[in-house]
């Protein structure tokens, strides 16, 4: 489901990038039917000039264009939240576990070789209800 959303977003971004030039053209050009051809040829001409430019011409070309912005998520919490959502755990549970200090119970029947975070996510059947194993 997530991959289909991502592919739809990329398709929409590519679609709007291709037709962004046609939006700025006046309606008089749209009536003669050459609107799509003009946009397509201008895109091809831009790509051809970018591929054939030298270093000096490229630096002058980039100055006249609007700068491209690349956004990189530098916050580690954002990536962790995305990983948690991808793994299927609810985000609010992850944040609650971080904010609250978990009291560690030392029961005799509890397996101490399993790390505490893993024990909190494991579920044990208690009666008819699944509960975290450390509550058992």
UniProtKB/Swiss-Prot annotation:
Keywords assigned by UniProt, alphabetized: Cleavage on pair of basic residues, Disulfide bond, Hormone, Neuropeptide, Signal
Is Disulfide bond given among the entry's keywords? yes
Q: Which cysteines are joined by disulfide bonds?
A: 124-133
> What GO molecular function annotations does the UniProt record carry, in alphabetical order?
melanin-concentrating hormone activity; type 1 melanin-concentrating hormone receptor binding
Signal peptide (UniProt feature, chain positions): 1-20
One cellular component term (GO) for this entry is: synapse
What superkingdom does the record give?
A: Eukaryota
Q: Which GO terms describe its biological process?
A: chemical synaptic transmission; neuropeptide signaling pathway
Q: Which family does it belong to?
A: Belongs to the melanin-concentrating hormone family.
| Function summary | Plays a role in skin pigmentation by antagonizing the action of melanotropin alpha. Induces melanin concentration within the melanophores. May participate in the control of the hypothalamo-pituitary adrenal gland axis by inhibiting the release of ACTH.
What's the protein called, per UniProt? Pro-MCH
Organism, per UniProt?
Answer: Oreochromis mossambicus
